[in-house]
């Protein structure tokens, strides 16, 4: 069974733990209890493949930022979460993405941008803004509500699909030998 190491990142209070607990336990946690670091495991079937999700729910608070490099090194894919009613959390996504790219030493890291709390009427980040940001990063964007469960599975499962595609790209890199080459090999004897 394939195991996927997923890391949930984002500013404090955006609902990272609520999303994770909703996926794992089908339960909405409405009281805010800042996370230092929690790990969850769940066996799921995605596109016909049984797999084990190893999800690391991380601290959003700045005082725990020193711990980020460590979990970013071990993660295979990242849910970058902001709250649609918190513009600052949306602006913070850029810092998380840059730190992930730096720690992974790669521009090609599986990520999904997640706009959480879409059940709330007081939106300050428009869907179009988030879609544009995700497009500029070349990653999917999904709106979620940990409260209603909307988009929760979709966000995590899309990240697994991104990791799968990333692994395939690494196994079969695009042919860089030029436009005229048809992958022919010449043998001179």
From Swiss-Prot:
It catalyses: GTP + H2O = GDP + phosphate + H(+). It is found in: Cell membrane; Golgi apparatus membrane. GO terms for molecular function: G protein activity; GDP binding; GTP binding; GTPase activity; phospholipase C activator activity; protein-membrane adaptor activity. The modification S-nitrosocysteine is found at residue 118. Its EC number is 3.6.5.2. Pfam families: Ras. Changing residue 164 to A: Loss of GTP-binding activity. The keyword Membrane applies. Transmembrane segments: none annotated. Belongs to the small GTPase superfamily. Ras family. This is GTPase HRas.
């Amino acid at each position: 069974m394939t195991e996927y190491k997923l890391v949930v990142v984002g500013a404090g209070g955006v609902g990272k733990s609520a999303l994770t607990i909703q996926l794992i336990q089908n339960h909405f946690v409405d009281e805010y209890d800042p996370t230092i670091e929690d790990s969850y495991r769940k066996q799921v079937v995605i596109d016909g493949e049984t797999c084990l999700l190893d999800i690391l729910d991380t601290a959003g608070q700045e005082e725990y930022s020193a711990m980020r490099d460590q979990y970013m090194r071990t993660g295979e894919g990242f849910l970058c979460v902001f709250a649609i009613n918190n513009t600052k959390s949306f602006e913070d996504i850029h810092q998380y993405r840059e730190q992930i790219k730096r720690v992974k030493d790669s521009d090609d890291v599986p990520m999904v941008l997640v706009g959480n709390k879409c059940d709330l009427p007081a939106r300050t980040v428009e869907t179009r803004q988030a879609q544009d940001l995700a497009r500029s990063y070349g990653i999917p964007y999904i709106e979620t509500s940990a409260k209603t469960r909307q988009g929760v599975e979709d966000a995590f499962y899309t990240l697994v699909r991104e990791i799968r595609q990333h692994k395939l790209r690494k196994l079969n890199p695009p042919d860089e030998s030029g436009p005229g080459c048809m992958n022919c090999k010449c043998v001179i004897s």
